[in-house]
Amino acid sequence: FYDGNQWPDGLPGFTETVREYMATLTSLGKSMLPLWARALDLEPGFFDPYFENNYTYFRMAHYPPVPDLGENEFGLGPHADTGFMTFLPQADVDGLEILDVDGEWFRPPQMHDAILVNTGQFLERWSNDRFRATPHRVIPPKEVDRYSIALFVNSAFEPVCECLPTCTGPDNPPKYPTQSYYDFYLWYMQNTYPHYGGFEEELADQDKSDITH
């Protein structure tokens, strides 16, 4: 889905630091899987097989100041992440807003050294809407630059996932098809970015093990 990283020149130790950070937070995410499982009335190790050789990616974002922000202008528009969970250390500058269940946007309180954990769309589908993907957006700052780093911890591409048995029943049938994260993400990309559909046959022939993690 993505090409290889473009590491910047002239920053000694940057690549190693990022890779270490990704490995550390991926390990943290996997250590939290029993918590998700127990919250969904599953055995603690239920999710472990789905996260062997899992797909993790990392994104850095820079939001330059916008002194005169227009209506419906965003640094990052409203959306929910696609995967299982996202780790988002709180930035020093406000801007992140989350949509609550009443349809109101709010800014989470600033907590030093805190990491926000967002649930993603694949977890929402897997849990048959028991967990809600976290809608959020970013309002750009007016005076200073804002930087953000997000790490997305997802299941492996290949395992096929169906709505969890503890989240379905006679009065609550599955709302989503049985599919792998690969198939879901391909569907998402094709529906979000229309030009992406042109690569469907090429992606179908590509060995999934060759996809950059």
Could you say what each language-model-derived stretch is?
Residues 1-213:
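Peripheral, non-catalytic segments flanking oxidoreductase cores
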